[in-house]
């Protein structure tokens, strides 16, 4: 803890960079094969994608619901703490739910996943521990394990959330490309802001 602030920043930068470099090698197309098949089968049967998490993964889930939706894969955020109090009703039989929990044993999310499975949803679990309860309940498990969080406490979820986001962003690129989303389609969903600007004919 006696190191300089510059040293702390340098350590985080190096550990985060290494984690992303490792993730880029791990998260090849074959890594996503089962998840892609599950999503494709669900979509063919009229199923929809939902995403949930509690704590920091809640924010990852909220962002990814927006990103998936804006790039050709409609996705609905599901509050992990509200699901067992009625919000699970947004998920119908045949839908797919991504459940994000790094350690994979958060009691509220475990209860949510159990409820969703009982109601006929398929689960893609995103955790850092394949032996965790949420990982084992998943029809598909996407492993986002990291060695360290990048600081001297090694507790606040920094690198684990960074790698989770990287993995899910990569999946969004694959889904976007598989569906052949072009500029015109993207602009239909994102007409405002700087991204929505286009040259007038």
State where each predicted segment sits.
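Residue-level detector of solvent-exposed, low-hydrophobicity positions
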Residues: 19, 34, 39, 172-173, ...
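An N-terminal, well-structured beta->alpha segment
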Residues: 1-45
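Glycine-rich phosphate-binding loops that contact phosphosugars or nucleotide phosphates
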Residues: 40, 48-179
